[in-house]
C-alpha cells in the first residue's frame, strides 16, 4: 500500500479527504451546476434541470458517479444537507472510498483520512489559494477551489447559486436582535449574525 501522494485526485475526492462526505457532495452539486444540470429551486433547495438533447451532447465528459447519483436524487427538489443522507448518494460515497483506501489515503476500518492524505490536502491548499477574482478559471479549477476552501470559495465563485441553493449560510443584519440588546443596555459593535433563512444578497453574477 502506498502513501497515496502519487494518486491524481478529482475535486470531489479531495473534498472527501479534507472535510468528509458532505463536502464531497457539495463539490458534486457545484459540478452539476457548472454543467447546467441543476438549479436553485425554492429557497435553500436544488433541483435537476430539464436538459435538451443539444445540451446533453455538448457535455465534454460525463459527471462523476457521485455527481450522477446526486443528479438522480434531485429529480425532486432537496436541501443540500439532506442529500448526504440519501441511500443512493451514500452508496456512491462508499464506492468512492474504496480506491482511496487502497491508495493508502483512508485507513481501515473507520475510513478516516490518513496522515499522508491530510498532508496532501494541506499542500494543495497552499498551492491553490483563493484568487482575487473568479474570472478566467476553468470549471476544474473552480471545483478544486471549492473542495479546498469550502464556503469561502462558494461565495467567491458561485455566489448567487450557493446562496439560493442553501450551500452557504445567509448573513443578515439582525435588527430585532440589536433592539433587544439595546433594551438590555449592551453596547455591541456589529450586530451581524448568521442565519439559514431570511434576506441578504448573493454577491456578483456568476
Task: For each feature predicted by the language model, list its residue ranges.
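Acidic, Ser/Thr/Pro-rich intrinsically disordered cytosolic tails and loops
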Residues: 1-206
Amino acid at each position: 500500500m502506498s502513501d497515496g501522494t502519487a494518486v491524481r485526485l478529482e475535486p470531489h475526492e479531495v473534498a472527501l479527504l479534507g472535510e468528509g462526505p458532505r463536502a464531497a457532495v457539495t463539490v458534486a452539486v457545484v459540478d452539476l451546476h457548472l454543467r447546467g444540470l441543476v438549479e436553485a429551486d425554492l429557497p435553500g433547495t436544488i433541483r435537476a434541470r430539464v436538459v435538451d438533447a443539444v445540451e446533453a451532447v455538448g457535455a465534454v465528459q460525463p459527471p462523476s458517479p457521485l455527481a450522477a447519483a446526486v443528479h438522480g436524487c434531485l429529480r425532486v427538489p432537496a436541501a443540500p444537507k439532506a442529500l448526504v443522507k440519501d441511500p443512493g448518494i451514500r452508496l456512491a460515497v462508499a464506492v468512492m472510498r474504496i480506491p482511496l483506501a487502497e491508495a493508502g489515503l483512508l485507513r481501515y476500518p473507520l475510513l478516516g483520512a490518513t496522515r499522508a492524505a491530510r498532508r496532501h490536502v494541506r499542500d494543495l491548499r497552499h498551492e491553490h489559494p483563493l484568487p482575487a477574482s473568479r474570472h478566467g478559471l476553468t470549471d476544474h479549477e473552480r471545483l478544486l477551489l471549492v473542495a479546498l476552501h469550502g464556503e469561502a470559495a462558494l461565495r467567491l465563485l458561485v455566489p448567487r447559486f450557493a446562496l439560493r441553493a442553501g450551500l452557504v449560510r445567509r448573513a443578515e443584519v439582525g435588527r430585532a436582535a440589536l433592539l433587544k440588546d439595546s433594551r438590555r443596555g449592551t453596547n455591541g459593535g456589529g450586530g451581524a449574525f448568521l442565519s439559514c433563512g431570511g434576506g441578504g444578497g448573493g454577491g456578483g453574477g456568476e
